[in-house]
Amino acid sequence: MVDLQLHQSLGHHNFTNKLTFYVNGVKRTISNPDPRGTLLDFIRTHEGLTGTKLGCSEGGCGACTVVVASWDREQGEIIYSAVNSCIVPLVAVEGKHLITVEGIGSSNNPHPAQERIALFHGSQCGFCTPGIVMSLYALLRNTGGQPSKEQIAESFDGNLCRCTGYKPIIDAANTFSCGRPGGCCRDNASGKANGAGATVGNGMANGAAAVANGNGAAANGCCKGNGAANGCCKSNGSAATTANGDDKEVDMNKLFTPNGLPLKPYSAKTELIFPPALKKYELNPLFFGNEQKVWFRPVTKLQLLQIKHAYPESKIVGGASEIQIEIKMKAANYNISVYANDIEELKTHKYIPGKGLEFGANISLSKLEEVCDKLVHELDPNVSQIYGAILEQLKYFAGRQIRNAATPAGNIATASPISDLNPVLVAAEAVLTVESIENGEEQISMTDFFVGYRKTKLPAHGVITKIFVPETVPRNEVVMAYKQAKRKDDDIAIVTACLRLALDDDFRISKARLAYGGVGPFTTAAKGTAEFLTGKLLRRETAKEVLEGAIDCLIKEFDLPYSVPGGMAAYRRTLIMSFFYKFYSTVLEKIGLAGEAQDNSALENTYDPQALLEVTRKHPVGSRDLTNPYEQRIVGKSDPHLSALKQVTGEAVYIDDIPPYHGECFGVQVMSTKPRARILSVDPSPALEVEGVVGYVDVNDLPSREANIWGPTPVGKEPFFADGEVYYVGQCIGVIIATDRMIAEEAARLVKVEYEELETVITIEEAIEAQSFFDYQPKAEKGDVDGAFAESAYTFEGTSRIGSQEHFYLETQGSLVVPEPEDGEMKVYSSSQNPTETQVFVAQATGVPSSRIVARVKRLGGGFGGKESRCCHLSSIAAVAAKKYKRPVRMILSRSEDMLTAGQRHPFVMKWKVGLDKNYKFTALEAKLYANAGWSMDLTKGVIERAVLHAENCYDFPNARIQGIPCRTSVASNTAFRGFGGPQGMFMAECYIYEIADQLGIEPDTLREINYLVPGVSSTPFKQAITEDFTVPDMVKQIKKQSNYDDLRRQVEEFNSKHKWIKRGLAHVPTMFGISFGATFLNQAGALVHIYHDGSILLTHGGTEMGQGLHTKMAMVCAEELKVPLSQVFISETSTNTVPNTSASAASASSDLNGMAVKHACDQLNERLAPYRERLGENATMEQLAHAAYFDRVNLSANGFYKTPDIGFVWGDPNPKPAFFYFTQGCAVAMVEVNTLTGDWSNLRTDIVMDIGRPINQAIDYGQIEGAFVQGQGLFTIEESLWLRNGALFTRGPGAYKIPGFRDIPQEFNVGHLRDRPFKHLKTIHRSKGIGEPPLFLGSSVFFAIRDALSYARRQNLGEATMPAGLVAPMTTERIRMLAGDSLYEHKGKIEPTEGDDKPFFVNA
């Protein structure tokens, strides 16, 4: 409890509890607001502005981004700061102007940023979009609407999108770039055209001509260097080049999208004005709260010191980036918080010539970045080195939103062992000024500030007020900063360092400071190594000895055990050495001891100039092939997503945006903390005593024990509530129901559960050893496998491993259940891909027929398979609570809860054996595919079946035996994920292609070409005949020509021959994905079409909209068939009371199934309207036709239905029907660049060609291709799920789990489709093809390109002609570094387990 009586020492300061600020131009004065909430809570709950979304609660995804505008009195200007409202406290906007996405535009009058993202197809599910819009808005306001491309790129580094692949968002933003669609000429953009029929950079147009957004150097040079013939792009719109190659002046008032839609010009004059009253507003000290928590907001340093003196236990808050995470994730309780970011005295900065930089402890990191950048450009480079090091670290420090709010003092005082900034301050010998009422002002050196894990020398009453960073001396001093993470931008460090050496005029080392983070419990200086270096003379003849000695010292100082907390022991040790090796070469270069490297052994080289190089990172460019010979009146056009403008303006409604119902409660699960245990007792009584708690539900509140068992398949059963035992960390034991979310969360933690722990199995290897398998083990078999192996000229065996992948849909699982007063009826609003199963299981859990449950789905904020079955559980337990308490119940999972409980993509271990004849043609395949199913089967049956059915990819095996074996483990049930087992099976196929080609000494493409399936001849291992639908070889030819593949290979060879540490790799990968549900009965769909008097049309179908554009495509089909404009067709939602018994929106079949059902309904209506069309003429409007038909009593409503013909595969049938209606195929070429010294890498270029048939909407299909590819790239490279040894998932949020960001996409991204095909064989809706899942596997091309790059490194370093067998996906930076084969790792970096220390810290399930 907090004493609300203000401490007597503070009484004279006139504290107030009233907060005054503006929201979207409207003044707000709030008295004593709820102290528990964040700014986001206020925006959504108090203001009802639900456009700003909650995505993660830790400032890692950017969905909650808003803009805070403030008046900078010192500069006399308005600063627009994008911030994460999910972590920033409400007090942070006092005296400022808060701008949300609703404040800048509406769907009827969108802001140019909103409109361009919408019309460039930059919004799919839309949940992330408002945050992205606001990041761009802040940039436009701060740059006057003319940002550079580099500014655009860095402005998005705190935003994530899981759908689009980012490219269309970047292209939309590029239209603002200094008046030039290709970007500002100072960004070195060129006007390179991409040929007829293609637009580069998603295309911009001036009139009808598409303007290219090229790559490389500007044709006319930068206007700043007087190279541009037409003057500065900022003044007149720079010369750009059209697709026809003609220079053309770009009029920024006449911009168009690729398909000719005009764009609204940007004018700063029409922007929301900054409230004039705020320029004069005087901040007053604040004190508000309740008995649980209070906030102070001092406005002077003295007030802050006095508060800290009166309340030494108080927590000082700057950006709240660390504190809010501790509150949310660790249930930390900071009863007294002090917001210190409005104290101007703590935000000053001054450079003292000849001495250094002094800055206030609470200057924002963005401002510090700006200050250091200015010093780096203005001072002698030797003097400004330390500021360059700070700048280098800040560049990749979190995201822009965090840097706008976070402060140096917060970063220092938090004492994180992986801080990016602290090693620089330690190496710089920075001095902290610490003040307190007791001791006044004192100085503490950063060199000995940290004394333990999260412990410092900061006194209990002390406040850091200033930081002084000395400048480096003008001569013979070198400072460099380094950081390595899993993802380059917005990621926590694995190892970070700042290394500093000073030498005298004889090049004798006079001082050394080597500060490392990520290698111990706190930021540590390598004092022993510094002592070794001090006094050493650097000469050519001594340099090698000094290098070797220093590295040996570093290894001894940072002796990381195999089981070190945080894992990656060998990688971290190798990074320690790699950073020093890079630094040492920098030192030798700067003091003039540069000499050519003598050979390829790291420790043999005294000076290695190539160690200084970094991987190439450029602003993304690329092309989309926009030719479409099959475009019809509506179908085939690239219309934007129907909800795009609603999504970019925040008007689109998701589950948690539905206004609260009267009496609504919030539910939070009580989850198991053990992976496998008996429940001895559950005591909710402490929770029930909390004010605001309504009650508790568990298995005893179901109609029967039998009703507790549910599951999407007959073999995939599990309980709603744990009943006697728990099987994984996170399993639902019960649900606390309370009047609001925060109360429910607090109370759920108070429920007491006692366990008796049982034996656990976490990994596939452990399951194999324990024979822990589920009974269902599908097998596909064809031919005489054993006989074929006996006659094979070659036989190869191997094992392929691929890890799991988190869905990371931006909208977490959510449900709102509203009980009706009669007959047990309920309305269920769910973020579900599967409304029918939601209906079925809610009915089961509440004991009523399905007819009394209406499941409704407006849209999902992403699904990717993760909301196919797992959503049903959440809706059902919410329904149990709603029934018991007769009140609406809302349950929205936090990001941590969602990742802990909702399951992931299945990890696989796949053991294969392949036979070949003397001509290298495959003779036989035998494989066993082990999948980690988790604790229950869920949808594993279908996943492992599809993995088996895709284990040959597109290669011909006359004899095959492939078996799937699901492993029972003690982790959450793994579930459907885009590709549904297909990518794992095809990954195995490409692994054996590469490994066998290595062993045979031939190119993988040679092996592929020999073994492609042959139409009319071949059949798959599941005996489906290959028809003319097989197009992979044709696409391979097309993509190799399009990408200039042979020339790229020559470039790679040449580059690698000249570069030692940076290597390039090139790979080509095909894919062949079967389209149909594995369960034949699911291949059906229904639709309902109503035509009203006014000619408007209401369409409902069985599919759900999750960003894939299904509603848009279905509306286009309906409009095409009924011969009306697209604007006349409206889709409101998907609901079980309009179209019953639907299949989940999954398997890439939703357009096929629902499209045909829509067509069937429209055919009926057209037949009924035919007489009226004949009578009234072809030009009659639908309104006229509907009127005439109505008065003749003609039914203007039709129900359509469709079931996929000619399929019906049955496992074990010796002569089965086809498993798939057709295959969607494609191929990709990827070229990467890898830094083998650190593991860092970048995707230089990707080209994709897909067989998409005759697309219903080409732009939507391209969005699916790009988005799936980037998601697949994540699967095969940076996305790594890790478990602790106690069975708990460690990677439970964007801080620990990394998906690709804006700067991880290909730097040149070219997408096209199979050309010159009539597609007459297709029997699909308008001869289109399903596209949602098939492109995802193409992301593996990046994995194999990295493999290719590493093969060059190993050939150079070890003389090995082949790569090690059994490479593991994802190919993380750690795995890349460990595979390089250089002497630093091979001789010094390896860490072997010792007796009693044989288990790594993390587990890969």
UniProtKB/Swiss-Prot annotation:
Gene Ontology MF annotations: 2 iron, 2 sulfur cluster binding; FAD binding; flavin adenine dinucleotide binding; iron ion binding; molybdopterin cofactor binding; protein homodimerization activity; xanthine dehydrogenase activity
Binding site for [2Fe-2S] cluster 2: 125, 128, 161, 163
InterPro entries the UniProt entry points to: 2Fe-2S-bd (IPR002888), 2Fe-2S-bd_dom_sf (IPR036884), 2Fe-2S_ferredoxin-like_sf (IPR036010), 2Fe-2S_ferredoxin-type (IPR001041), 2Fe2S_fd_BS (IPR006058), Ald_Oxase/Xan_DH_a/b (IPR000674), Ald_Oxase/Xan_DH_a/b_sf (IPR036856), Ald_Oxase/xanthine_DH-like (IPR016208)
EC number, as in UniProt: 1.17.1.4
Deletion phenotype: Exhibits less than 1% of the wild-type activity towards xanthine and hypoxanthine under inducible conditions (2.5 mmol/l adenine). No activity after cultivation without inducer.
Induction pattern: Most efficiently by hypoxanthine. Twice the level of the transcription increase compared with the level due to induction by adenine, which exhibits 10-fold increase from non-induced. Low levels induced by ammonium and nitrate. 43 mmol/l ammonium or nitrate and 2.5 mmol/l adenine together induce only 2- to 3-fold higher levels compared to non-induced level.
Domain 2Fe-2S ferredoxin-type: 17-104
Binding residue positions for FAD: 316-323, 397, 407-411, 420, 464, 483
Stored SUPFAM superfamilies: 2Fe-2S ferredoxin-like, CO dehydrogenase flavoprotein C-terminal domain-like, CO dehydrogenase ISP C-domain like, CO dehydrogenase molybdoprotein N-domain-like, FAD-binding/transporter-associated domain-like, Molybdenum cofactor-binding domain
GO CC annotation terms, alphabetical: cytoplasm
Industrial and biotechnological uses noted in the record: This enzyme can be used as a potential additive in the production of low purine content food, which is recommended to people suffering from hyperuricemia that can at worst lead to gout. When used in conjunction with other enzymes of the purine degradation pathway, uric acid concentration is significantly reduced.
Co-factor(s): Mo-molybdopterin; [2Fe-2S] cluster; FAD
Keywords, comma-separated and alphabetical: 2Fe-2S, Cytoplasm, FAD, Flavoprotein, Iron, Iron-sulfur, Metal-binding, Molybdenum, NAD, Oxidoreductase, Purine metabolism
Cofactor: binding comment: Binds 1 Mo-molybdopterin (Mo-MPT) cofactor per subunit. Binds 2 [2Fe-2S] clusters.
Catalysed reaction, written as an equation: hypoxanthine + NAD(+) + H2O = xanthine + NADH + H(+); xanthine + NAD(+) + H2O = urate + NADH + H(+)
Active-site residues per Swiss-Prot or TrEMBL entry: 1333 (proton acceptor)
Temperature sensitivity of activity: Optimum temperature is 43 degrees Celsius. Quite stable as loses only 5% of activity in 1 h at 30 degrees Celsius, 12% at 40 degrees Celsius and 25% at 50 degrees Celsius.
Keyword Cytoplasm attributed: yes
Binding site for Mo-molybdopterin: 833, 864, 978, 1147
Activity regulation info: Completely inhibited by allopurinol and significantly inhibited by adenine. Inhibited by Fe(2+), Cd(2+) and Zn(2+) and strongly inhibited by Cu(2+). Mg(2+) and Mo(2+) have no effect on activity.
pH-activity note: Optimum pH is 8.5 in glycine-NaOH. Optimum pH is between 7.5 and 9.5 in potassium phosphate, Tris-HCl and Tris-acetate.
One GO term (biological process): cellular response to zinc ion
Function description: Key enzyme in purine degradation. Catalyzes the oxidation of hypoxanthine to xanthine. Catalyzes the oxidation of xanthine to uric acid. Oxidizes xanthine, hypoxanthine and pterine at high rates. Can also act on purine and guanine.
Subunit structure: Homodimer.
Protein name listed in UniProt: Xanthine dehydrogenase
